[in-house]
């Protein structure tokens, strides 16, 4: 599925999804959890029950699947402002799931070597566990062939830093862990955990910061319901992070531009 997701974005179809654990899956815990993990960093997760004989609820296979899937579903809900901002970019043609060469064009990314990894927006590098490489009986595995472009990259779950411009092999991926890296300097708009977008606190701004020199991002929002965005009803907020010569971090959230019905000022 991973090359299909990448190819869909390159073909002008950014809102791609597929059945969690396969349409007739539902018996293999490891496949189930790995699917929930990487599809957290995709536009949509389609978990449809009733087509096959097996239940497809996120908790249907018991533990540890229930807890691990819950963790990733929670994270997906928290990343909604980040995803929504890049969904706005997709209106103009730049996909949410990006082939590596879209962000980092070079001889290596122009070939097929990075077809099993991708960028989620500009800041997350996702390298799914798509096959059994060296898995033990509990499903703990490794991932080979992770290409990190030039620059510094941070393991999203541990905070460990990696220098880019190289390929990483034998990257530890215990059962709970998706190999995902965030670009140093990233500013990630987030929100409160929620079961439905109606539960999002629009008056709360959360930014996950990875200060490195001077960086900035743009957060986009609108009413999330109507097509009023086509008439310009939406808002943008510029957020800057600057590391001073004294190694102090100055964060600037600029005044939001625009308006829409229901916007919380």
PLM features: what roles do these ranges have?
Residues 177-265:
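Accessory, solvent-exposed terminal regions and/or long lumenal/extracellular loops of proteins
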Residues 1-177, 183:
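Catalytic-domain carbohydrate-binding cleft regions of carbohydrate-active enzymes
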């Amino acid at each position: 599925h991973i090359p299909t997701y990448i190819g869909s974005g390159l073909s002008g179809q950014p809102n791609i999804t597929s059945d969690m654990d396969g349409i007739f899956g539902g018996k293999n815990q490891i496949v189930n959890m790995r699917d929930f993990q990487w599809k957290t960093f995709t536009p949509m997760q389609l978990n449809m029950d009733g087509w096959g004989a097996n239940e497809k609820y996120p908790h249907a296979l018991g533990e540890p699947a229930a807890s691990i899937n819950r963790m990733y579903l929670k994270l997906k809900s928290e990343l909604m402002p980040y995803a929504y901002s890049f969904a706005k970019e997709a209106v103009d043609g730049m996909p949410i799931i990006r082939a590596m060469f879209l962000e980092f064009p070079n001889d290596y990314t122009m070939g097929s070597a990075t077809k099993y990894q991708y960028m989620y927006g500009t800041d997350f590098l996702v390298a799914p566990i798509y096959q059994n490489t060296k898995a033990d009986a509990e499903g703990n595995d490794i991932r080979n062939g992770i290409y990190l472009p030039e620059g510094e990259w941070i393991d999203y779950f541990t905070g460990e830093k990696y220098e880019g411009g190289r390929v990483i092999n034998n990257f530890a991926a215990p059962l709970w862990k998706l190999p995902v890296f965030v670009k140093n300097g990233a500013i990630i708009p987030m929100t409160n955990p929620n079961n439905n977008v109606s539960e999002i606190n629009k008056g709360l701004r959360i930014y996950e910061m990875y200060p490195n020199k001077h960086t900035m991002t743009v957060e986009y929002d609108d009413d999330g319901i109507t097509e009023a965005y086509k008439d310009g009803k939406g808002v943008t907020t510029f957020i800057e992070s600057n590391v001073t010569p004294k190694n102090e971090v100055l964060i600037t959230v600029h005044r939001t531009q625009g308006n829409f019905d229901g916007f919380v000022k």
